[in-house]
Amino acid sequence: PLEKKDMNKEEIIKYCLTQEDTYKDCPFTDDFESVTMKHKKNKKWFALIMNVHNKLYLNVKTDPDYSDILRSSYDYIIPAYHMNKEHWNTIIIDKNVDETLVKELIEQSYELTK
């Protein structure tokens, strides 16, 4: 069987940019590692990509009812770091992560923040 590889920051950014009318922003002047993905029209974030202590994290917005299901089903999905924990989740990006699920959650976050 093929060994699963970690998704990397560039792959996540590239996928986020496939969503219509989006752009990458680096809003934190003291932190060049963290990147937000935003809608061009309303400037709202739909993803926050962070590199903390050599670990990659992705924050996405989810429906609050779905958040509970995700957190109980996947140990790599936790309440969002430094954000509204009812609406946002952090995905710990490592080799255990389901790439298809990550892409679905990016799409949902994009739709929820339009």
Language-model segments: which ranges?
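Charge-dense, helix-prone N-terminal extensions
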Residues: 1-114
